[in-house]
Amino acid sequence: MSDKTAVLLLQMGGPDSLDAVEPFLLNLFSDRDIIRIGPAFLQPFIARLIAKRRSPGVERKYEEIGGKSPIRELTESQARALEDVLGDGYRCFVAMRYWKPSTMEALAAIRREGISRVIALSLYPHYSRATTGSSVNELKRVLSQSGVQFQMMYVDRFFDHPLYIDALAEKIREGLDDFHPLAEVQVLFSAHSLPQSFIDEGDPYLDHIRETVRLVMERFEGVTHHLAFQSRAGPVKWLEPSTDEMLEHLAAHQVKNLLIVPLSFVSDHIETLHEIDIEYAQEAHKLGYSRFRRSPSLNTSPTFISCLADLVRRVEG
């Protein structure tokens, strides 16, 4: 057996081709940790109908950003960068919740290398049962079904880690460099939305998001900021305000220069590359903004990778 430690990066994944969009959506809508559609025995059937109905529109969006999600390549780049920082005692692997490489494939790769000690590191900074909770539940299901024994450790949140806050602040400064003078710019944090019912039932996601915003904005005294939520899906009550509603509100109050900061996303994917860069940018143009920019995503930011390395070292004690 190897004396190395495996670091398993947990991420949601994304379709790696246009043909993969429908099965990716099927996996997503079949997950009762993220969405409960009717009784459990009916969800697979209903999920199949929803995936088939939604896939043509989603395929068009992926076509506009290159025909696939970049999230696998970006997450694998994060894994390689993290392995370089951690050094010889570690191997880093990637497990995607809704696409490839799957959790089962990732664990099989770890097993082939003879590694028995695994740190599961969620790449969702803010804990929610719909994101980290779902990924960890899937990991535990696969472990139980496989019968393979690993020494498991978990990192399930890092919303207030100083290096994560540093990394976000660095990207915001990069974004603000596109504006002059600084005093005229407002900052809009855009986090992935959740059904309000999750928060009502005690999910800590919203509190985590707000704390991240508070800690980041301590670095930007005098800059006006706002928080909104993107990527709603379905006819339930979602966290408010939505990002598109906030864009309208700020435009009505004569805001002309806006930096949008993607929050809860640690790498580029459809929510940044299409929803923000195309859809919200077009809306901002129609609303009369003079300058609308997005701060760069964390991706392989050295400060962010250092954050992940510190999380690994801390959980090992």
From Swiss-Prot:
Keywords: Cytoplasm, Heme biosynthesis, Iron, Lyase, Metal-binding, Porphyrin biosynthesis. Its main location: cytoplasm. PROSITE patterns: FERROCHELATASE (PS00534). GO terms for cellular component: cytoplasm. GO terms for molecular function: ferrochelatase activity; metal ion binding. It catalyses: heme b + 2 H(+) = protoporphyrin IX + Fe(2+). Fe cation binds at residues 192, 271. Catalyzes the ferrous insertion into protoporphyrin IX. The keyword Lyase applies. It is an enzyme of class 4 (lyase). PANTHER family: FERROCHELATASE, FERROCHELATASE, MITOCHONDRIAL. One of its GO terms (biological process) is heme biosynthetic process. InterPro entries: Ferrochelatase, Ferrochelatase_AS, Ferrochelatase_C, Ferrochelatase_N. Pathway: Porphyrin-containing compound metabolism; protoheme biosynthesis; protoheme from protoporphyrin-IX: step 1/1. It comes from the Bacteria. It is found in: Cytoplasm. This is Ferrochelatase. The keyword Metal-binding applies. Its EC number is 4.98.1.1. Pfam families: Ferrochelatase. Belongs to the ferrochelatase family.
